[in-house]
Structures are given as C-alpha cells and as structure tokens.
C-alpha cells in the first residue's frame, strides 16, 4: 500500500510538469512558424521600378514564355523544378494540379512578387521580364486569387477603385456589357451597396465575381486566375468560363485550377505534380496519349 501511495504522489507531481512541457512545445512550434515567415520576408529583395531597357515598343503583351524556371523559398527544398510553358494573346492555358504543387507560386512569380532561382521569363519573345519595371509590368496584367480582398466601400468602388461620377457610369456600362449585371442586381442597393467590414456580407462566390469584374475592368493584356471560380456554383462558373473564352482574343489567360472540368475548356493544359510538369497538351491530346487520368 505504501508503494502505491508513493507512485500516486509521484504521478501527481509529474502530470503538471508534463502539461507544462506540452505547452512549451506548442509555443516553440508557434515561434518556429513566425520565425520562418519573418525569415522569408527578410530574404525578399526590394522591388526595383527602374526600366533597364528601352521599352517604348512594349505597348501590348503578345506572348509570355517561361523557360526552365526553378524556385525555392529561403531555407526550404525546391518547390518548382525546370518549369516551362508559354501563353499568347488569344489563348487560355491551364496549370492543373493538386494543392501545394506550386501553381500559385508560379503566378506570384509572374506578378514579380518572387524572383526565380533559375530560368527566364521572356515577354514578346525577346524581352527579359527583369528588364521591365515592376510598376509598368503590373499595369499590363491583372489577377484574381482564391482569397479575394474586398475593400470598405461600395460595389462601384471595389470594381473601379475610384470615385468619379464619370467612371461610375463606365463601370455600370462595363458590367452590363460583360454580363456581371445579372449577378450584381441582387445586391440590396445594386452598385451602391456598401461592402467590407461595415457593409453587406457577401458570399465567397460573389466576392470572386467582384474581383473578376475588377480585374477585367482594368483591360489587362494578361489575366492570371488562381482558383478564381472555386467558390462559385457550377452554373455561374460555366458562364464565367464561357465569358473568358469569348474575351481571349483580346488577351492571354493563365488559369490555375484543380478542377478537371474547368481545365477542359482551356486551349492547352500543363499538369504540375511535385513541382514538375509531368504532362502537357490539349485536352484531346492528353486523352489520345492515354494521359486521360489527368483530365
């Protein structure tokens, strides 16, 4: 009996210590995540806005070619390995793959948020992307991400990011022309509906519609879509994809998705697995090559 009492006493003393050790481990893991994020941020090079080359002729992006691009975050294993693909005006290409394979990072590199470890990105067949100022480049492209930013303001403000009455009228005409009006007419005050933290709480699909209208209103030469229809219902998604197909003669489109049905509508598919392009071709070519498991 005495031995059992001693064991119970020792156990009662060990349990609080074990709990403290578990809490300490949680704090260490949280600190590690914070350190990795700060290390990644501190390792980023400052953006340069100076134009290195004479780019007076860059009035329109006719094509973009990614050539053997590789990338890794500081202190981590390689995320993208020898990625090569191209897109030109009049095309919608698709980067197809599961979450975590590097699709989103590829678009972030194209937006100049990250610099590739190796490889080149060429614009209009001959211009190195690094020779174009970041500011100028971003006036030529537009993007829609899976996580949409809705600003405090009206629906109009969120689309045009301006306040002039003249531009407001242009936005309304734009939305009618492109078919967004049928989605926005259900908002309580239509285009004057207040959105954001102090406004109407809209669904994820509606947020993506706002973001897509915002991107297309900029009239970009290159449109980057990162799971941009993932929160939409099937009917809305199909209508939006058909809209994009009808607009592609005016611009190039890169669609990032894990949805097979969305990928089938693109002109060309690049399948990414573990940071590598493992298959590429039109949907029809992938089927003929017995690679239909990808589509």
Label each region the model flagged.
Residues 8, 15, 138:
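Conserved catalytic core of two-component sensor histidine kinases
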Residues 23, 27-30, 47, 70-75:
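An intracellular "coupling" helix at the cytosolic face of ABC transporter transmembrane type-1 domains
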Residues 40, 47, 160:
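Conserved E/DxxT/N motif and adjacent residues on the DHp alpha2 helix
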Residues 44-47, 189:
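Flexible, glycine-biased helix-capping/connector loops in cytosolic signal-transduction modules
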Residues 47-59:
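Pre-NBD coupling/linker segments of ABC/ABC-like ATPases
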Residues 58-295:
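ABC-type nucleotide-binding domain
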